[in-house]
Amino acid sequence: MARIACFVERYNFSDPKESRALENFRRVAHEKGHTFDFMFREGISEIPKYDAVFIRATTDPLFTAYVVSKTAWELGLKVIDDPESIQICGNKIHLYDLFKKYDVPHIPTLFLSKDEIHHKRFLEIFENLGKPVVIKAPYTSFSRYVEKVACESSFRDVAKRYFRKSDLLAVQTFMPTAFDWRVGVLNRQVLYVCKYMIPKGRWKHGCKRRGKPTFIWGRTFSLRRENAPLALKETALKACDIIGKGLYGVDIKEIDGKYVVVEVNDNPSIYAGYEDYRNRDLYGKIIDYLAD
C-alpha cells in the first residue's frame, strides 16, 4: 500500500470537471488499496509522511507547487511533476533549444533578445517565418503571454511588453489549424489523445474574450490512444524523451499529414469527460506509476 499526497490549491475544485477528475483519482487509489490525501499549502510539512506526491496545482518555479516538487524529490519520493520537468517545460526557450538539439520536429522558431528591437531584425524574422508570427514569453501557461502579430508596430509593442518579464522571447511561424492535437504521455508511454478545437474566429484553443478578463475555450474531442495515428504518437514520445519520464501534455499541429510539436507541458489538464473520455484507465495508470 502506498501513501499518496495530491497537492492542490482551492481553485482546483472550482471547475466541476476538474473536481470530478480529482475525486476519480482518489477513488481509484482507494480501490487499489492506497491512501490518497489532498494536501494544501498549509500541509506541506507533512510531505515526509508520504511515499509519493501528485501535483495538480499550477506548476511554476516561483509557485508553491515547485517547492512541493523539489522537497518531495529531495526526500526520494515519487513525484509528478518532478522539479526538472517543471524547469524545462516552464522555460520555452530551453525547451525549443532541446527540440533543435535532438531533432524533434517543431514549429520554426527564432529567438529575440532585448537589444534586437529594431527594423532590420523584424524584417529578418518576417522573411524567415512569414507573416503573421506568434510571440511567446518563456514562462507561459494556459495560452497567456502568447500573441499573434502581423506588422512591425504590433511586433514592437508586444515585444516591449513581454520584455518586462523576460530577457529573451520565442518567435514562431503561425500555423493555422482547426485543432491542436494533445497527447498525454506518462513514463514514456502514450496515456491519452485528444483534439483541442480552436474556437470559431479564434486562432488558439484558449483565447481571451475581447474587452473581458475571461477566457473562451474550444471543445475537446477524445480518441482511444490505440486509434490515434502512429506518427502522431511517435512524435509526442520523441518530444518527451528529451525531458524525462513524467506526466506530460504534448501539443502538436498536423500540417499536410506531418506532425510538428508546438510545446510540451508539465502538469497537463485532466478534466472528467474530456481527456479521460476514451481512455478511462488513465487514472489507474497514474496511480500505479506513483505507487510503484
What is each stretch, according to the model?
Residues 227, 241, 254-292:
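C-terminal active-site "lid" helix and adjoining low-complexity regulatory extension at the edge
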Residues 133, 191-192, 248, 260-263:
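Protein kinase-like catalytic core scaffold
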Residues 38-40, 172, 245-256:
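A short glycine-rich, hydrophobically flanked beta-strand micro-motif that places a catalytic Asp/Glu
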Residues 10-113:
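Conserved N-proximal alpha/beta basic substrate-recognition cap immediately N-terminal to
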Residues 2-8, 75-76, 86-181, 230, ...:
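Active-site nucleotide/adenylate-binding loops and adjacent lid/helix of ATP-dependent enzymes
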Residues 144-240:
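Phosphate-binding site of ATP-dependent enzymes
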Residues 58-60, 139-140, 267:
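Short glycine-rich anion-binding loops that position phosphate/pyrophosphate groups of nucleotides
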